[in-house]
Amino acid sequence: MTQLYSIELIEEHEAVNFYSLHLDEKELSELERFFEKFPEGCYFDEDVDTIIAWLDRIGELGALERYFRYEGRYGDGVSAIPIETSNLRLYCIRLSDKILVFGNGGVKDCARWQESETCLVLKNLD
């Protein structure tokens, strides 16, 4: 089944622009849906704070390759934040130092993103 989606601008920074996938049948973008799953005060607060700190750093310095954990096949650009050990992963596609497209993410529930239920939106893109 093909899902219809758009890519919307989330934030503009001098060094990088953040975009997010937005499935047509959903009210929120995938990035917004990620943060909705982990409200302030939840069990994963520390992990969310780590991801936010990385987003701030990337916003300031750009989407440099060294800031990402590569999760996909060679050359597909699928990456995750944070690069360090964490219970959560926020998945994205790094197109360049200046363009970052976020998908969704969640609790690290398997060894490979292709096996994760939370990453189906990335796997099913046409």
Features from the language model and the residues they span:
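Active-site beta-strand-loop-beta-strand hairpin of nuclease catalytic cores
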Residues: 93-102
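Short, surface-exposed charged micro-motifs
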Residues: 89-91
